[in-house]
Regions:
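Short beta-turn/strand-loop junction motif enriched in small, turn-promoting residues
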Residues: 29-33, 71-72, 90
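Beta-strand signatures of extracellular beta-sandwich domains
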Residues: 41-45, 82-84
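Beta-strand-rich domain onsets/edges
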Residues: 3-38, 46, 128-129, 133
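Short Pro-Gly-centered beta-turn/loop motif in secreted/extracellular proteins
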Residues: 67-80
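Short beta-strand/loop motifs in extracellular/secreted proteins, especially
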Residues: 38-42, 116
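Short, acidic Ser/Thr/Gly-rich low-complexity loop/linker segments typical of extracellular
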Residues: 49-69
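Feature of secretome-associated and extracellular-like proteins
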Residues: 19, 78-133
């Protein structure tokens, strides 16, 4: 029994020493209601080269509110990225018009395996974003 416990502890310790994985998490808060905005689709793209072209999306996923993480090895590399929040369908589902049907946020990853958080505070006619923690 002691051998089994020691083996499990050693495996847990080994996994803690494994290479860290960078993450990007986002959340979308509707400032008019004070509630998360479920169903907003996001895309993550990495900029390639100096011409400013954007590679095909790395990840697409519907948003269910707070702290949805996008985890892919390609996002942990330093570079310029763009996360696009497709807000038009969300507002349409709420029977509301919006001036910003798409909100692109371009940001710079400066270190390998960084943990990043990008909040989006959203209303029909405006938005705000910042580097979260």
């Amino acid at each position: 029994m002691k051998l089994v416990i020691a083996s499990v502890i050693s495996l847990l310790s080994f996994s803690a020493l494994a290479a860290p994985e960078g993450t990007l998490s986002v959340h979308i808060l509707n400032q008019q209601t004070g509630l998360p905005s479920p169903g907003v689709q996001i895309e993550l793209d990495k900029q390639q080269g100096r011409a400013g072209s954007i590679s095909p999306p790395v990840k697409r996923m519907p948003m269910g509110g707070l702290n949805r993480s996008i985890r892919r090895r390609r996002i942990v590399e330093p570079g310029v990225y763009k996360v696009t929040f497709k807000t038009g369908d969300y507002f349409k589902s709420q029977n509301m018009n919006t001036f910003f049907p798409v909100v692109p946020v371009i940001f710079n990853v400066t270190k390998q395996n960084q943990k990043l958080h990008i909040p989006l505070l959203l209303s029909q006619y405006g938005y705000s974003t910042y580097r979260g923690s």
